Protein backbone atom coordinates (compact mmCIF):
# COMPACT_ATOMS: atom_id res chain seq x y z
CA UNK A 1 0.00 0.00 0.00
CA UNK A 2 2.78 2.42 0.92
CA UNK A 3 4.68 1.63 -2.28
CA UNK A 4 1.56 2.32 -4.35
CA UNK A 5 1.05 5.66 -2.55
CA UNK A 6 4.62 6.76 -3.36
CA UNK A 7 4.24 5.75 -7.00
CA UNK A 8 1.04 7.77 -7.29
CA UNK A 9 2.64 10.75 -5.53
CA UNK A 10 5.67 10.67 -7.84
CA UNK A 11 3.44 10.39 -10.92
CA UNK A 12 1.40 13.39 -9.78
CA UNK A 13 4.54 15.45 -9.26
CA UNK A 14 5.90 14.53 -12.66
CA UNK A 15 2.73 15.29 -14.57
CA UNK A 16 1.51 18.29 -12.58
CA UNK A 17 3.55 20.67 -14.76
CA UNK A 18 3.00 18.92 -18.06
CA UNK A 19 0.41 21.44 -19.20
CA UNK A 20 2.12 24.68 -18.18
CA UNK A 21 4.91 26.71 -19.71
CA UNK A 22 8.16 27.57 -18.03
CA UNK A 23 9.95 30.70 -19.18
CA UNK A 24 13.68 30.16 -19.54
CA UNK A 25 16.51 32.62 -19.29
CA UNK A 26 17.02 33.94 -22.80
CA UNK A 27 19.54 31.92 -24.79
CA UNK A 28 22.63 33.69 -26.01
CA UNK A 29 23.55 34.03 -29.62
CA UNK A 30 22.00 34.09 -33.02
CA UNK A 31 19.64 31.60 -34.63
CA UNK A 32 21.14 28.89 -36.77
CA UNK A 33 21.20 28.87 -40.55
CA UNK A 34 20.03 25.24 -40.56
CA UNK A 35 18.01 24.51 -43.71
CA UNK A 36 14.82 22.48 -43.76
CA UNK A 37 11.84 21.74 -45.97
CA UNK A 38 8.34 22.98 -45.35
CA UNK A 39 5.26 20.80 -45.50
CA UNK A 40 4.84 21.99 -49.11
CA UNK A 41 8.42 20.94 -50.00
CA UNK A 42 9.95 24.44 -50.13
CA UNK A 43 13.51 24.74 -48.73
CA UNK A 44 13.90 27.46 -46.11
CA UNK A 45 16.41 28.67 -43.56
CA UNK A 46 15.79 30.76 -40.47
CA UNK A 47 18.23 33.22 -42.03
CA UNK A 48 15.56 33.85 -44.70
CA UNK A 49 13.52 35.65 -42.05
CA UNK A 50 16.17 38.13 -40.85
CA UNK A 51 14.60 41.53 -40.40
CA UNK A 52 11.35 40.06 -39.09
CA UNK A 53 10.52 39.02 -35.55
CA UNK A 54 9.76 35.29 -35.29
CA UNK A 55 7.66 33.03 -33.15
CA UNK A 56 8.95 29.50 -33.62
CA UNK A 57 6.80 26.75 -32.17
CA UNK A 58 8.00 23.13 -32.11
CA UNK A 59 5.13 20.66 -32.07
CA UNK A 60 3.96 17.17 -32.98
CA UNK A 61 0.54 15.77 -33.89
CA UNK A 62 0.65 13.35 -30.93
CA UNK A 63 1.38 16.14 -28.40
CA UNK A 64 -1.83 17.14 -26.58
CA UNK A 65 -0.54 20.49 -25.22
CA UNK A 66 0.75 21.31 -28.73
CA UNK A 67 -2.71 20.79 -30.20
CA UNK A 68 -4.29 22.73 -27.33
CA UNK A 69 -2.17 25.84 -27.92
CA UNK A 70 -2.73 26.22 -31.68
CA UNK A 71 -5.76 28.51 -31.17
CA UNK A 72 -3.49 30.79 -29.11
CA UNK A 73 -0.79 30.76 -31.80
CA UNK A 74 -3.38 31.44 -34.51
CA UNK A 75 -4.64 34.42 -32.51
CA UNK A 76 -1.08 35.70 -32.01
CA UNK A 77 -0.42 35.44 -35.76
CA UNK A 78 -3.66 37.25 -36.50
CA UNK A 79 -2.80 40.03 -34.05
CA UNK A 80 0.90 40.55 -34.89
CA UNK A 81 1.28 39.12 -38.40
CA UNK A 82 0.12 42.38 -39.95
CA UNK A 83 2.97 44.10 -38.08
CA UNK A 84 5.63 41.77 -39.49
CA UNK A 85 5.67 38.83 -37.07
CA UNK A 86 6.41 35.53 -38.81
CA UNK A 87 5.10 32.33 -37.22
CA UNK A 88 6.92 29.09 -37.98
CA UNK A 89 5.23 25.99 -36.57
CA UNK A 90 8.08 23.47 -36.81
CA UNK A 91 6.77 19.91 -36.86
CA UNK A 92 8.98 17.20 -35.34
CA UNK A 93 6.89 14.17 -36.31
CA UNK A 94 8.62 11.29 -38.08
CA UNK A 95 8.65 11.60 -41.89
CA UNK A 96 6.60 8.39 -42.13
CA UNK A 97 3.64 10.29 -40.67
CA UNK A 98 3.74 13.24 -43.07
CA UNK A 99 0.24 12.49 -44.37
CA UNK A 100 -1.05 12.73 -40.81
CA UNK A 101 0.67 16.10 -40.39
CA UNK A 102 -0.94 17.35 -43.62
CA UNK A 103 -4.36 16.15 -42.45
CA UNK A 104 -3.89 17.85 -39.07
CA UNK A 105 -2.82 21.15 -40.65
CA UNK A 106 -5.77 21.05 -43.04
CA UNK A 107 -8.32 20.09 -40.37
CA UNK A 108 -7.16 22.93 -38.10
CA UNK A 109 -6.84 25.52 -40.91
CA UNK A 110 -3.24 26.35 -40.00
CA UNK A 111 -2.09 29.01 -42.46
CA UNK A 112 1.43 29.70 -41.18
CA UNK A 113 4.57 28.05 -42.53
CA UNK A 114 5.12 24.48 -41.30
CA UNK A 115 8.82 23.54 -41.53
CA UNK A 116 9.66 19.86 -40.94
CA UNK A 117 12.33 18.81 -38.43
CA UNK A 118 11.86 15.01 -38.22
CA UNK A 119 15.39 14.39 -36.90
CA UNK A 120 14.98 17.24 -34.39
CA UNK A 121 18.22 18.91 -35.45
CA UNK A 122 16.80 22.41 -35.13
CA UNK A 123 14.86 21.48 -31.97
CA UNK A 124 18.05 20.14 -30.38
CA UNK A 125 20.05 23.20 -31.44
CA UNK A 126 17.72 25.20 -29.18
CA UNK A 127 18.30 22.75 -26.30
CA UNK A 128 14.75 21.43 -26.64
CA UNK A 129 13.81 18.76 -24.15
CA UNK A 130 10.01 18.64 -24.36
CA UNK A 131 7.10 19.72 -26.51
CA UNK A 132 5.68 22.17 -27.13
CA UNK A 133 8.66 24.52 -27.26
CA UNK A 134 8.17 28.13 -28.33
CA UNK A 135 10.85 30.71 -29.06
CA UNK A 136 10.56 34.44 -29.56
CA UNK A 137 13.29 35.76 -31.84
CA UNK A 138 14.01 39.40 -32.62
CA UNK A 139 14.49 40.85 -36.10
CA UNK A 140 18.28 40.47 -35.77
CA UNK A 141 17.93 36.73 -35.19
CA UNK A 142 18.55 36.67 -31.44
CA UNK A 143 16.53 34.37 -29.21
CA UNK A 144 14.75 36.64 -26.73
CA UNK A 145 12.67 34.12 -24.81
CA UNK A 146 12.02 30.39 -24.72
CA UNK A 147 8.85 28.77 -23.38
CA UNK A 148 8.62 25.05 -22.72
CA UNK A 149 5.10 23.68 -22.32
CA UNK A 150 1.60 25.00 -22.93
CA UNK A 151 1.54 28.75 -23.67
CA UNK A 152 -1.82 29.50 -22.07
CA UNK A 153 -0.29 30.46 -18.72
CA UNK A 154 2.05 32.95 -20.40
CA UNK A 155 -0.23 34.45 -23.03
CA UNK A 156 -0.16 37.94 -21.49
CA UNK A 157 3.66 37.92 -21.24
CA UNK A 158 4.03 36.67 -24.80
CA UNK A 159 1.69 39.34 -26.16
CA UNK A 160 3.66 42.06 -24.33
CA UNK A 161 7.01 40.70 -25.59
CA UNK A 162 5.73 40.34 -29.15
CA UNK A 163 4.37 43.88 -29.09
CA UNK A 164 7.86 45.09 -28.16
CA UNK A 165 9.50 42.90 -30.82
CA UNK A 166 7.30 44.15 -33.68
CA UNK A 167 7.63 47.76 -32.50
CA UNK A 168 11.43 47.46 -32.37
CA UNK A 169 11.52 45.78 -35.79
CA UNK A 170 9.33 48.53 -37.29
CA UNK A 171 11.48 51.31 -35.85
CA UNK A 172 14.68 49.65 -37.18
CA UNK A 173 13.16 49.38 -40.67
CA UNK A 174 12.19 53.08 -40.53
CA UNK A 175 15.78 54.13 -39.73
Where do the model's predicted regions map?
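Conserved redox-active cysteine motifs that mediate thiol-disulfide chemistry
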Residues: 50, 58-75
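Thiol-/selenol-based redox modules, centered on thioredoxin-like
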Residues: 136-175
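Short, internal strand/loop/helix patches
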Residues: 31, 102-140
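Alpha/beta-hydrolase fold active-site loops
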Residues: 53-54, 85, 132, 142
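N-terminal "domain-start" segment that seeds a small globular fold
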Residues: 19-46
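Short hydrophobic alpha-helix segments
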Residues: 47, 126, 145-147
Amino acid sequence: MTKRFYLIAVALLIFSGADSATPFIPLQGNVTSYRMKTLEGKKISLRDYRGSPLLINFWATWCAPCRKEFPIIKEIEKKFGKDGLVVLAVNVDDTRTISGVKSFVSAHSLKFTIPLDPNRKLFNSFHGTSLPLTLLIDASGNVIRTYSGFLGAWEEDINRELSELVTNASSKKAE
